[in-house]
Amino acid sequence: MKRLAMIAACYAVPLAADPLDLIDYEALFAEKAADVMEVSETRSILCIGDITLIRDESLPRGYTGIDEGGQGAMGCFVSILATIESAMQACEAELPADQVETQMAYRTQALTFYGQNTVPEASFELVEERYNALVASQIEGARPFCSNLDLVTTLADRVFSDEGAAEISGMMSTPRLPVANPCL
């Protein structure tokens, strides 16, 4: 899965703490100020369960998040789904019907999980709007890879397999912030 995640990185936008930009990190750091650890003049850390949030102005969005729970980072999974979808659109290709069915089911489950676990909680409609914007933002960047579409179909084969299903089910089994790191 790690090799396939690296393939996805070729298509995906840089991962921050929250690829759909829905988590209010400032509010979390303010609300849990007593739990914030200042580790340097520019960096502070907040641990919420198995999620470690890092605030650092040198980061692309000022924050990043690391899911240390072992189930997999939901933000990464949402980014991979968006990568597959944007590549299929960019290359005017289609996945096999059974994979499309699985993809749509995962998309609905993942976006529901995302909205329920972001802070503040977000409606499915807002999460879907942000997801669609992420997909659209990746289409142009995916076009040069159309000659190597097998990279994406291999990723889809892996993600939408029975083995992948067990990983995805485990990933969605524990409510937590949908951060993007580590990426599978």
Each language-model region and where it sits:
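Sec-dependent signal peptide recognition
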Residues: M1-I7
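N-terminal signal peptide c-region/cleavage motif recognized by signal peptidases
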Residues: A12-P14
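Helix-boundary capping/turn motifs
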Residues: T52, M74-L81
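Eukaryote-specific, low-hydrophobicity, charge-rich regions
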Residues: L53, P60-G69
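Second-shell loop/turn segments in exported
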Residues: G65-M74, M88-Q99
